[in-house]
Regions:
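Gram-negative outer-membrane beta-barrel transporters
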Residues: 24-28, 123, 128-131, 152-221
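Hydrophobic, lipid-facing positions within transmembrane beta-strands of outer-membrane proteins
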Residues: 13-19, 31-35, 47-53, 93, ...
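Membrane-embedded beta-barrel scaffold of Gram-negative outer-membrane proteins
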Residues: 56, 62-64, 98-153, 158
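Outer-membrane beta-barrel translocator domains and adjoining extracellular loop/strand segments
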Residues: 1-5, 43-49, 76-82, 89-91, ...
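Outer-membrane beta-barrel transmembrane domain signature of Gram-negative proteins
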Residues: 1-31, 67, 150-165
Length: 221
């Protein structure tokens, strides 16, 4: 098995500037438009736009939508620290730092319900998609004892997240929150086509019970 040596020196550097504009139409509509420009060492100048919209048709309903571009240098072994415990050999670009490029867009609808001991009773639905234009691929399926690292380079990769949340205070200072999320993550591996992204959990659920004493001196979860 090959030995990975890290000397603590990288050539990662970037500098950027960011600006945004906020528009309000009373208390029912808000729009925030942002634009970021970054210079990345070895990659040049990149622009990352983003927008956030919020609309309240009535007091009980809040609708949000947002989207934008994200850029970051990959750090393959740090981002996938679990591979170090597999005992497998690494091949490909595991020492390189490609510039990952992704677009994320989606929205949320929150409905505040007219019951419970506080105004914090609600149900919300979320959907977000992340579409990768460039990504560091970690391929566990090239060979039995090998993990291969390589750039996406025109292949497909995306993640869809669907989430539902419910929160209620049945009595004062006692909160119940339940969350369920479904993740559909697909990636196109070299020679295998579009497959489920390895090491990704499709279903996640959380149930949290919280009680707080007077003045929140003690909080129990």
């Amino acid at each position: 098995i090959g030995r990975v040596v890290y000397d603590g020196i990288t050539d990662l550097a970037n500098a950027g500037v960011f600006g945004e504009y906020t528009f309000h139409a009373g208390e029912t509509f808000t729009a925030i438009a942002g634009l970021r420009g970054d210079w990345f060492y070895g990659e040049g100048f990149k622009v990352s736009p983003r927008v956030t919209l919020k609309y309240m048709p009535v007091d009980e309903i809040v609708i949000r939508a947002n989207g934008g571009r994200g850029l970051r240098y990959s750090t393959p072994l740090v981002d996938n620290i679990g591979v170090l415990s597999t005992g497998k050999m690494f091949t490909g670009s595991y020492k390189e730092h490609i510039l990952e490029d992704a677009w994320t867009f989606g929205g949320n609808i929150t409905y505040y319900l007219p019951f419970g001991a506080s105004s914090n009773t609600y149900v919300s639905f979320d959907f977000f998609r992340t579409q990768f234009a460039q990504q560091m691929v970690v391929d566990y399926e090239q060979a039995m004892n090998v993990i291969s690292f390589y750039a996406l380079d025109g292949r497909q990769s995306y993640t869809d997240n669907y989430q539902i949340d419910f929160s209620v205070d049945p009595v004062e200072r006692f909160n119940i929150t339940a969350t369920f999320r479904y993740t559909n993550a697909k990636i196109e591996l070299d020679g295998k086509g579009l497959v489920e992204k390895p090491m990704t959990s499709q279903y996640k659920g959380v149930l949290n019970l919280q009680y707080a004493t007077n003045l929140n001196r003690w909080i129990f979860d």
